[in-house]
């Protein structure tokens, strides 16, 4: 038996294992990965939405905090509070449904970064920034409206339409 024949037989024995591994990783990416993406989106949406609701309920306190605790340079406290609250109430809705997820995650990331670097350095904010970066770079996953819409845009004339989800 030559070395080439032995090598071929060795590779042919590995082929089923490699195919099984490829199938497993594809399943994990589409199946488990999609559920994990959905869980991340829901978890972040809950955190930001609850924060926005608390700001509305205590609007005077919210304006006080934006004026004294974490002022935004160049913007008065009421305007900054309105922008911040708007981000915390609107963007999570987009995350939950998985529509425009990348675009919705950007202002949420900027909000978390602002709080991390100007107010208090908390591990929670850092974790949120990591997960939001994940959503910005990877997209919302297969369990999202973005994914289902993009499947119908494969032959669209819209540039980069396939990469939107």
Language model segments and positions:
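Extended, low-polarity transmembrane helix blocks
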Residues: 1-60, 74-86, 90, 97-165
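Short Gly/aromatic-enriched secondary-structure transition segments
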Residues: 61-69
């Amino acid at each position: 038996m030559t070395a080439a024949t032995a090598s071929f037989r060795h590779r042919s024995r590995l082929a089923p294992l490699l195919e099984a591994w490829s199938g497993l990783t594809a399943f994990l990416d589409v199946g488990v990965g999609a559920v994990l993406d959905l869980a991340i989106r829901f978890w972040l949406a809950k955190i930001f939405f609850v924060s926005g609701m608390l700001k509305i309920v205590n609007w005077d306190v919210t304006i006080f905090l934006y004026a004294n605790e974490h002022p935004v340079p160049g913007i008065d406290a009421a305007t900054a509070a309105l922008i911040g609250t708007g981000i915390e109430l609107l963007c999570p809705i987009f995350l939950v449904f998985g529509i425009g997820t990348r675009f919705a995650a950007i202002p949420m990331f900027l909000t978390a970064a602002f709080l991390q670097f100007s107010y208090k350095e908390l591990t929670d904010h850092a974790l949120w920034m990591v997960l939001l970066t994940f959503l910005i770079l990877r997209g919302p996953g297969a369990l999202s409206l973005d994914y289902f819409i993009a499947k119908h845009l494969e032959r669209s004339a819209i540039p980069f339409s396939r990469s939107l989800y």
